[in-house]
Amino acid sequence: GDFVRTVGIPKDFAKAVKILAAGHRRRIDVGRIDYVSRDGSPGVRMFANIGSFGMSGLTDRLVNQSKKRFGSLSFFAATAKAMWQYDNQRVRLSFDDAPADGVDLTINTVAIANGRYFGGGMMVAPDASLDDGEFDVIAIGDMSMTDFVLKSRRMYAGTHLSLEKISHRRARVVRATPAEPGQVVELDVDGETPGILPATFTV
């Protein structure tokens, strides 16, 4: 999985067992998300890897809806469907409890990253560290689906941070709200869609 890639556990079963048997321990950061459930009630989730929102949230919802119908093809089918259904959304982000530092963005996806990988191997946050006390915040901006597909290879390779329409910063607290009234921006937390924005991400 994506988190396993970050911590460096090999796919080979025997090698993975050997590493686990060695008993090495590492203290890592854990993220907390305070968000709004679909019924309007407050929700809380903890995560070790990445929380995100935008197209990633729609993709996860479609994956979970299609698993029974498509089985192992569900992720690819849902991703393709999400790419054509999703319209980029406007959100407002503020960092470290400083509203004056906020920015309005039109986004495809924003990843609040403790780990480096999500989406089945995409190295969305190549500089993220599990124990530095901060999130890496990667905003994939107002990118067309054609651009997204053409640049996806660089996102999987982790060489995308210098691309136009992709921004990167670090923060301990990230607040995200829809910039337009009534807009539904879906969350993605380790492959699940627990709710929608507004949300606060805290290390």
Regions found by a protein language model. Give the residues of each.
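Residue-level signal for secondary-structure boundary sites
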Residues: D39, S56, F118, M145-T146, ...
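Catalytic core of DAGKc-family lipid kinases
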Residues: G1-N108
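Gly/Ser/Thr-rich active-site loops/lids in small-molecule metabolic enzymes
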Residues: K67-S74, G115, G120, P126-V149
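Residues in well-ordered beta-strands of folded domains
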Residues: R32-D34, N49, S94, A111-A113, ...
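Short acidic, gly/pro-rich beta-turn/loop elements at beta-sheet edges
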Residues: S41, L58-D60, G120, D147-F148, ...
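A generic structural signal for well-ordered coil/turn residues at beta-strand boundaries
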Residues: R27, D87-Q89, T106, I112, ...
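Glycine-rich phosphate/pyrophosphate-binding beta-alpha loops
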Residues: S52, S56, A111-P126, E192-T193
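ATP/nucleoside-binding phosphotransfer catalytic cores, i.e., glycine-rich phosphate-binding loops
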Residues: F95-A100, D104, S129-L130, A139-V203
